[in-house]
Amino acid sequence: MSGKQPDAGPPPIQLWTRDGFQGALSAVTRSTYAPEYLSVEGPHAPRRAVLERLTPDDRDDPDALPTMIATSRQGVRLHVSARRKPMPYVVRNVEADEIHFIRIGTVRFETDVGCLTASAGDFVCIPRAVAYRYAPIGEAMHSVIVESPAALKLAPPLPSGLLNTARDLKFAEIDPDMPVGGPTRLVLKTFDAENTVFTLPHDPLALGMRLSDSVPVWKLNLAAIQVHAYLPEGGPPSQFLASTTGDVLMFNLSARPGGRPPVHINADFDEVICYVGGPGAWGGCTEPGTLTCVPKGVIHHGPSEDVPEGYQAWLLETRATLRWTPKALAVAELMETGQYLPHPSVSK
């Protein structure tokens, strides 16, 4: 069995929706609890992983790239990084925009449009073909990286309310004191099995002055993104970021007042949630850095988000069909889709 059937009361509503909650919708009730399942075989199954149980390659090997934990035919991918030393090379991702979410630590990013320092809770946007490197300030850092082949941009439902970009959006700034240095490796990151590496005579991130107003590299803290609440019954969260094609959406899924979400069949989007941390628990997610994934078409309910103690989490929705990599599967568990606990069959 899976999850916990709600206590006495009316049967939970079951929704089937297209385009997230923006398209066609069907609502029904049923006498049984739809998210329950006895077992599952195959890759299209709900899973969860505590990221602290996975050691990224770049933690102990400065030359390594971040470790991929999920991939897709469409090119949407997830990685984790835990560097303890600076990158000894520069990367230019020529296939995808990247969003780096800093879970732990403080990280300095140097790019060929400027530098910024990001702290725990910050999202850092590095668009396609912007060269960069990063390093922890201190002994440790941990980040989750989302790759999107389509361009990413801030896309709140209204110009004001969810975001205060004038106050909270911070852009990379040129460091005029960065030395030009000597020979530097530039890794062009592509979908090929082997990356292309140029050796340059100087550091490509050493800049002179800015001549344009536009700065494509920015940071925004999760705590600065407002939650969208519907009282008393509750309703879907509002996106703060989207790809230009609508294939990738990101939401603040932190604690908010309102009713528990309905039982849901999301016809078009895989749902990946990162539980950042408490003090409150989000259902079965109590360990910071717990990552959950419910593939499209899998019936789920999900925990209540009305947690008085408070917690932080974010949601990634993607039309891409994600598949966990072997390294991620080694630390992942089958998940029930009621409270997002490990499925009971895991302990048998």
Each predicted region: which residue ranges?
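Jelly-roll (double-stranded beta-helix
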Residues: 1-348
